[in-house]
Amino acid sequence: MSILKSFIEVSEDSHFPIQNLPYGVFKPTLNDQARIGVAIGDFVCDLSVLADLKLFDGKLKDTKVFHQENLNSFMSLGKELWSEARKTIQNLLSSETSTIRDNKEYREKIFHSISSVTMLLPARIGDYTDFYASKEHATNVGIMFRGKENALMPNWVHLPVGYHGRSSSIVVSGTPLKRPWGQTKSDEPDSLPTFNPCRLLDFELEMGALIGGESTKLGEPISIESAKDHIFGLVLLNDWSARDIQKWEYVPLGPFLAKNFGSTISPWVVTMEALQPFATKPPTQDPQPMKYLQEQGNTTFDIELSVSIKSPKMSKPHKVSTSNLKYMYWTLTQQLAHHTVNGCNMNAGDLLGTGTISGPTEDSYGSMLELSWKGSKVVSLGTETNEERKFIQDGDSVILSGLCKGNGYQIGFGNCEGTILPADKRQ
């Protein structure tokens, strides 16, 4: 069986072959209006131009959704039109189709070099919920703070634990973030809390699911069977965490200032349709979850993930961890079904974070908290500078990457990168 090819040259190591076509929001120049495109090789295909040229047909014939400053309108159209759009774009970019391939004027209007455009947040994120769905991560953290005998809380194997995060401070890859201030307290007996910049700044390797389809009605749950039809696509997510602030504040309601100072997502949204060839079975769940969470078959995805760190002294990043979405105990569809089982309504553009994705080995842990085991050991940044870390320092850049390896092609997410700036000076 021949592999689908594009007339746009795509290198073997590209994250963006014609089998992928992730959606993003971009500006060709800073003064231009934002619009929607898909990535193909080293280029962005401008979907607003395709629409202006009347190259979409069917229900999308006169669409204006690709002229918008975010993907929300397109994501709200639902699975049928997502699939129709993908089929049309894939056909237009195919090496077998002459419409754009043989029209120089069209090509000059449609394609922009990825390196020349400004990428924006892909969606207007209304609500953000972060889960705690990796058994390895939850166990590691539990051992550190409660001991082996009480590592997992009793509820953990019965439901996907989550909390509501802050959508206003979600930023697109490449946006620097300042080290946050907050209250911390030492472990010394009779010590008092102090107000200071975070000393234990951490990353969390996560993925985020963007919700699509029509808004659900308040009081109507999304069933486990239909949950997949409400997920438009996935992004990489770094849920930055201030561990010392979190330790003092989290009882009894969970993290607050330790999380809401910033979360970084990748600009390209890889659709569920593109990911389907990489569907795989999740870990066996024991005990069997309640009926509303039960699902069969290949309900998660084999997505290889990595974390690299680049200090100001380094010329290139050094990989510190590799993991995989397939390790997650609770799947994205289970998370969505649980989120709505009480009738909570969902809107296009809502974001669900998986929680830290840790694997079974020490080199697959998804946070510095685990890699340094609560700061008890150092993490090497390689031989170029022989630097070491226990947590993230000022000037450090953290780069997340994700990749699905197919037969003759690969589907990637690009990078999710953020750099930590020094904290503001305060009295």
UniProtKB/Swiss-Prot annotation:
Active site: H137 (proton acceptor)
InterPro entries: Fumarylacetoacetase (IPR005959), Fumarylacetoacetase-like_C (IPR011234), Fumarylacetoacetase_C_sf (IPR036663), Fumarylacetoacetase_N (IPR015377), Fumarylacetoacetase_N_sf (IPR036462)
Needed cofactors: Ca(2+); Mg(2+)
Residues binding Mg(2+): D239, K259, S263
GO biological process: homogentisate catabolic process; L-phenylalanine catabolic process; tyrosine catabolic process
Hydrolase listed as a keyword: yes
Its EC number(s): 3.7.1.2
UniProtKB keywords: Calcium, Hydrolase, Magnesium, Metal-binding, Phenylalanine catabolism, Tyrosine catabolism
Keyword Hydrolase appears in the UniProt entry: yes
Any one GO MF annotation of this record: metal ion binding
Binding site for substrate: Y132, R146, Q246, Y250, T356
Pathway field: Amino-acid degradation; L-phenylalanine degradation; acetoacetate and fumarate from L-phenylalanine: step 6/6
Chemical reaction(s) catalysed: 4-fumarylacetoacetate + H2O = acetoacetate + fumarate + H(+)
NCBIfam families: fum_ac_acetase
Family statement: Belongs to the FAH family.
Name under which the protein is recorded: Fumarylacetoacetase
Source species of the chain: Dictyostelium discoideum (Social amoeba)
